[in-house]
Amino acid sequence: MRIAQKDLAPLLSRITDIRMAVFSSWPYLYDGNLDDEHKYLQHFTHDPESLVVGAFDGEALVGISTASRWETHPENLLSYLPGDWRAVPVTDILYLAESVLYEAYRGFGAGRAFFREREAFALEIGRRYVAFAAVVRDPNDPRRPIGYRDLVPWWRRLGYAPIPNALCEMEWKDHGRDKAHTHHLQVWMKEL
């Protein structure tokens, strides 16, 4: 369900907990900190054309998904779009920033609902495209859990496709590292 901006402030600590828990695992391995998380989430409390969708178990928030205008995302994602994609006006793209859900709640439809809500929101604010960036890791990385289920087939079933040669770069600190380093993410897009 959509979370109204006026209702976000009391949930920010819980949202931060969920993000840090989920992003600490494969494939992100993000070693986050509360200050960076709170700064990042402030955007969603102020931009009327951003969205936070929550998954709840009763009153308990167990997952969130966000979206914001492509042009307001902190990273300059447009610079990573190759060739013809640069002709697409940035005002036509909604960036699907993240979907994070506690593992015990996966496989029951929350992920599909996250995409459905964000796609509907994109159309409501006049966006023709939705895009996200997925971290790229070596499939032979020894940190990859046995039995990890790759989301690529599922994203394709939802109608998303990777944009060839659209690899963006973002920095974050992995668990077990002393400092942040560059990670590559594949941009995926869907026309609505």
Where are these regions (language model features)?
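Conserved acetyl-CoA-binding loop-helix of GNAT-fold acetyltransferases
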Residues: 98-101, 107-124
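Conserved acyl-donor/pantetheine-binding loop and adjacent beta-alpha core of acyl/acetyltransferases
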Residues: 64-99, 142-143, 166-179
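Conserved active-site alpha-helix within GNAT-family acetyltransferase domains
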Residues: 123-128, 136-165
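Helix-loop element at the rim of GNAT/NAT acetyltransferase active sites that forms part
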Residues: 17-32
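A short beta-loop-alpha structural element at the N-terminal edge
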Residues: 1-15
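Active-site rim helix/loop that mediates acceptor-substrate recognition in acyltransferases
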Residues: 28-57, 66-69
